[in-house]
């Protein structure tokens, strides 16, 4: 068994993270668990691994959208698919999310940005998604973007990405209980079991 929060590692350009982002608050309430939201720059890790994104593999991309379409109704979600992909400015969204985690509104921004990406067709990290998502949650886009684009915030994102790499993380979303990683939205329940029982139960 493990005590304390579950670390929720995600990158804003990840399509499958949409499913986790939009249900995590309900999961936290239902199970009495705290999640620590940890944005990181997955693309840096994938580049080191010479991993080819789904966008360059049509069959995998078709499956991805179908898989999300099948799973979304379980969580009461109605995305308009396919959403714009790949998200070419996801690093901007990651920086804004990281800034928000330090000020207490990060999770709200992430939910708003994913909602606009998957329900309104506004690519995450790009405009109008970023500024509109910030306004949706009562934040000033000019102030936040200045903070997000600062050298200090860029250094923090690199440090968080390094921390993810040290944990062996190679995908988003990943849930970490102690130092035990669970990759994928469909492994969230396994992570909850591991935290409660120290093993996976049926």
Specify the residue positions occupied by each region the protein language model found:
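Structural alpha/beta surface segment adjacent to cysteine/selenocysteine redox centers
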Residues: 12, 18-117, 194
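C-terminal cap of thioredoxin/glutaredoxin-like
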Residues: 3-7, 11-33, 115-202
